[in-house]
From Swiss-Prot:
Protein's name according to its UniProt entry: Ribosome maturation factor RimP
Keywords: Cytoplasm, Ribosome biogenesis
Family from the record: Belongs to the RimP family.
Organism for this UniProt entry: Shigella boydii serotype 4 (strain Sb227)
CDD domains on file: YlxS_C
InterPro entries: Ribosome_maturation_RimP, RimP_C, RimP_C_sf, RimP_N, RimP_N_sf
Protein purpose: Required for maturation of 30S ribosomal subunits.
């Protein structure tokens, strides 16, 4: 998934502090709006609890206060990826081959921006998703948002 320049810079800045606390930085989203939001997703083998999120928030806030890469007011949110886990990297897609995913594309493919199907394969920066029995190939750089579809 293509990250903005700001998201790339933020990822570089906060990866080390997150990993130093023993967590994986799953990904980040910076959502611009009336009240902008920096959303950070973390995970660990043992799962994530509220105290973990608070610890990461405290550490990341300290880094962001010093570096000050965001020029607008924003809210910082730290959370686990949840059941509808967002996918950010080729490694994430490869880890969840065989799982159902929803995709929102930056540019339409076959006049569609929204797709839902099962991740079949990952090849470099391309993913194959089986949609209604047919394989569709998408460039990771064209994926604006991707989430696993939880099944109960």
């Amino acid at each position: 998934m293509g990250l903005s320049t700001l998201e790339q810079k933020l990822t570089e800045m906060i990866t080390a502090p997150v990993e130093a606390l023993g967590f994986e930085l799953v990904g980040i989203e910076f959502i611009r709006g009336h009240t902008s939001t920096l959303r950070i997703y973390i995970d660990s083998e043992d799962g994530i609890n509220v105290d973990d999120c608070a610890d990461v928030s405290h550490q990341v806030s300290a880094v962001l206060d010093v570096e000050d890469p965001i020029t607008v007011a924003y809210n910082l949110e730290v959370s686990s990826p949840g059941l509808d886990r967002p996918l950010f990297t080729a490694e994430h897609y490869a880890r969840f081959v065989g799982e159902e995913v929803t995709l929102v594309l930056r540019m339409a493919v076959q006049n569609r921006r929204k797709w839902q199907g099962v991740i079949k394969a990952v090849d470099g920066e391309m993913i194959t998703v089986t949609v209604e029995g047919k394989d569709e190939v998408f460039a990771l750089s064209n994926i604006q948002k991707a989430n696993l579809v939880p099944h109960f």
